């Protein structure tokens, strides 16, 4: 019985080292994401909070919510484009139509990445796939 328990114990140890996880994120990525979120919070406070409010809930029918936003989380490139170039026209967020205009904010690519990382990881949003400056630079106006 003792031998069986030892074999099972060592088998579990070996098995635990061979498994992989689709959710694994290298520690360096975690550190970069954490730093980006920290920087993004400052940018959000300066540039975005007056319309989208401190809690990211926006103003009903005027400014769309960022908190628990289906648009933000499902339309990553369009969200980056909106911050980078501004947006006009109709968008639907959480089933509600918004027709207001958001002007271009004049942020640099790294600042856009930081604010996107902040808003996609705050107020009930979770995005472990860090948005990079290179990703922002690759987003065109059209």
Per-segment meaning from a language model:
Residues 3, 37, 109-112:
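Short alpha-helical patches at coil-to-helix transitions and adjacent helical residues
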Residues 25-26, 48, 57-59, 94-96:
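A short alpha-helix capping/helix-coil boundary motif
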Residues 33-59, 73-85:
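Sequence/structural segment immediately N-terminal to covalent heme-attachment motifs in c-type
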Residues 1-24, 31:
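Bacterial Sec-dependent N-terminal signal peptides
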Residues 60-67, 88-142:
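Axial heme c-ligation environment in periplasmic c-type cytochrome domains
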Residues 20-43, 138-139:
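Electrostatic cytochrome c docking/interface patches
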Residues 70:
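Active-site catalytic pocket residues across diverse enzymes, especially alpha/beta-hydrolases
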């Amino acid at each position: 019985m003792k031998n069986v328990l030892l074999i099972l114990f060592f088998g579990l140890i070996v098995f635990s080292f061979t498994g992989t996880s689709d959710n694994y994120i290298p520690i360096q990525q975690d550190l970069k994401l954490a730093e980006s979120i920290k920087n993004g919070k400052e940018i959000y406070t300066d540039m975005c909070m007056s319309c989208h409010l401190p809690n990211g809930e926006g103003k009903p029918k005027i400014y769309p919510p960022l908190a628990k936003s289906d648009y933000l989380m499902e339309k990553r490139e369009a969200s980056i484009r909106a911050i980078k170039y501004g947006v006009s026209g109709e968008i639907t967020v959480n089933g509600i139509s918004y027709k207001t205009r958001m002007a271009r904010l004049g942020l640099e690519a790294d600042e856009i990445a930081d604010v996107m990382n902040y808003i996609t990881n705050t107020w009930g949003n979770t995005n472990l796939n860090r948005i990079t400056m290179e990703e922002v630079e690759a987003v065109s106006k059209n």
